[in-house]
Each structure stands twice: as structure tokens, then as C-alpha cells.
């Protein structure tokens, strides 16, 4: 669910590298071959290193060595290893949210079913990048990954409010402030569910996360004011 009217704090603003899905993905068809190759090298290197330990522990020197590029080239694409990883993961999360919202809007699905499907998309994302999420979130070792998930869930709840403003509870303060406050409230809880699920021994049951993420939704989010 896009939620672009409410950009999360700390979100990277640079043109992001994305998971390897071909030159046509997310505008990369407009980039020259050298730039696409550099981005692919950075993607592969940061995902490999972040699967071995928290991204905060990765030095620029380690990343450029693993990617086989120099520092000057690196700083043309990002200002830190964490920024490279954020760009990769945000691109995957945003793509899943956008596709889900398009399908949900076309089918006029209720919020609970949308969120259940969204939880399934999140499980797919977590399993796709399982080593790095396990390395970073089990034991709360990576604030970067925690904040990334909070930002994602915040934007997702904002998107539900955009889709149906009647979901926003009445109360003190302007609508924009309440939308932001309630979105953050739900987002922190959902991020906590992710961390709790990841703390389980593998193989983890996707149905457990989907059920918990849906059951934890507050009543005001699934019923109109």
C-alpha cells in the first residue's frame, strides 16, 4: 500500500537499487550498463554481509571490497552500507504493497482481508531475506532493520486511511496528526510481531505470523467511525 503522502522519517531519498529482477525493474532500464552492474554488485555484497551480522557492523571498506568496486564509485550510489540495504529492502516491500493495494482496490476487499494478505506478503519478504533479518533482528541487534519495518507498516496503515478515510478514529487533533499517530501505533506493534516470529526456531510457521498480525489489528481499523 503506497502511502506516499506520508513519507516515513529517515527513509532513503536516493534513487534506490532494487532486488535483481531484470533491467526493466523500477526504472533501471533507463540506467547505463555500468550503473546497473555496480548496483547489482552492491546488492549482492550487502545482502551477503548483512546475512552474517547486523548491517551496522559493516564498514564501507568491507562492502566495497566484497562488491569489487572503489570508494569513489560507492559514494555515487549511497552514503553507507545501511543505506544500500535499506534501498534494496524498501524496493521489495514497496513493490509488494503496491501490487497488493491494486488487487485489493479492484476487488473492494475489507480491511481485515487486506491485512491478512499483506501479512502473507510480509512473510514472503521475510523468508526471501531470512538470513539477514535473523542476523539483525533476533536479539534486537539491528536498529536499522527495526526502523525499516516500522516505516513500512506506518506507510501501510496510512495507505488504508487514504483508501477509506472513515477508518480514522474520531478524537482530538487534526486528521493528519491522528492519521500519523495511529499509523505509528499499529506499526510498532506489527514490527514487534515480526521480531517475535523471527525469534522462533526454524522452520517457522507462516500461518502463525499471519494469524497474529491479523488478530492484533485494533477494532477501530477494521470498522468505520
Tell what function each PLM region has.
Residues 58-59, 134-136:
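Short, hydrophobic secondary-structure boundary micro-motifs
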Residues 2-23, 158-166, 179-180, 187, ...:
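C-terminal peripheral helix-coil segments that are non-catalytic and often amphipathic
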Residues 37-48, 52, 66, 83-103, ...:
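Alpha-helical structural segments
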Residues 101-131:
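Hydrophobic alpha-helical connector segments
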Residues 120, 140-169, 177-191:
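Amphipathic alpha-helical packing segments from all-alpha helical-bundle domains
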Amino acid at each position: 500500500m503506497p502511502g506516499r503522502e506520508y513519507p516515513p522519517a529517515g527513509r532513503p531519498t536516493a534513487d534506490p537499487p532494487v532486488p535483481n529482477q531484470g533491467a526493466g525493474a523500477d526504472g533501471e532500464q533507463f540506467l547505463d550498463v555500468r550503473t546497473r552492474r555496480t548496483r547489482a554488485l552492491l546488492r549482492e555484497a550487502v545482502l551477503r554481509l548483512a546475512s552474517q551480522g547486523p548491517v551496522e557492523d559493516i564498514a564501507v571498506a568491507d562492502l566495497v571490497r566484497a562488491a569489487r568496486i572503489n570508494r569513489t564509485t560507492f559514494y555515487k550510489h549511497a552514503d553507507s552500507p545501511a543505506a544500500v540495504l535499506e534501498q534494496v529492502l524498501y524496493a521489495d516491500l514497496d513493490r509488494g504493497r503496491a501490487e497488493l493495494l491494486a488487487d485489493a482496490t479492484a476487488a473492494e476487499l475489507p480491511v481485515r482481508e487486506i491485512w491478512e494478505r499483506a501479512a502473507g506478503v510480509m512473510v514472503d519478504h521475510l523468508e526471501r531475506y531470512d538470513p539477514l533479518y535473523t542476523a539483525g533482528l533476533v536479539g534486537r541487534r539491528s536498529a536499522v532493520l527495526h526502523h525499516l519495518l516500522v516505516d513500512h507498516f506506518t506507510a501501510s496503515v496510512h495507505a488504508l486511511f487514504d483508501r477509506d478515510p472513515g477508518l480514522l478514529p474520531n478524537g482530538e487533533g487534526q486528521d493528519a496528526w491522528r492519521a500519523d499517530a495511529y499509523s505509528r501505533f499499529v506499526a510498532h506493534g506489527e514490527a514487534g510481531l515480526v521480531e517475535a516470529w523471527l525469534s522462533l526456531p526454524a522452520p517457522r510457521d507462516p500461518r502463525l505470523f499471519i494469524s497474529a498480525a491479523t488478530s492484533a489489528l485494533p477494532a477501530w481499523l477494521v470498522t468505520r467511525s
